[in-house]
């Protein structure tokens, strides 16, 4: 190892710190969105439920990543693994349902916005949802067998895809589009922008932690 190089342990610690910070930020984002929209807004409640599910899924995903990057296999019957395997498809389903509602609003012509911009937004959102689903599923499959190199490569590939999509979604959330609601206030820009940056940073650090994690030999 070259002098001054960051050790695998430090990459792992940085990734876990970023992921736990993202859990707290996701819960805070859900609460802020509900407060800003008002408790009578049904769509805001769905968005808050989405944030809550995302935080819970991330808690379990982070626990599995902590073991995986320490070369500790997770038994197939482990409670955290089973919980993540059971819940993340529900999070993806809720995200897809909310995405479909937005897409219907775009297609209805009720919004006086540029169709190209709406298409780009819908495409980025859908890509983000599918990439996150693949990231969750890839770790679920890889966690019991940290020595499985193809499973590790698949997880790395999806983390590599998810990072730029998280950044793109963050840009979409903070850059106003003419005809698509009013311009966000400074507080909202800060909240959504900070959450997006945390998501990107946590994803990139998780990618590096997996890349540098020890490779146990097959039994």
Q: Where are the model-predicted features located?
A:
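Short, Lys/Arg-rich N-terminal segment immediately upstream of the first membrane anchor
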Residues: 1-12
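Short, charged juxtamembrane terminal tails flanking transmembrane helices
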Residues: 2-4, 209-219
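Alpha-helical transmembrane segments and immediately adjacent membrane-interfacial amphipathic helices
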Residues: 13-36, 46-69, 85-142, 153-214
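Membrane-interface helix-boundary motifs at transmembrane edges
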Residues: 39-40, 72-83, 144-152
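Glycine-rich, often acidic, oxyanion-interacting loops/wings at catalytic, nucleic-acid
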Residues: 43
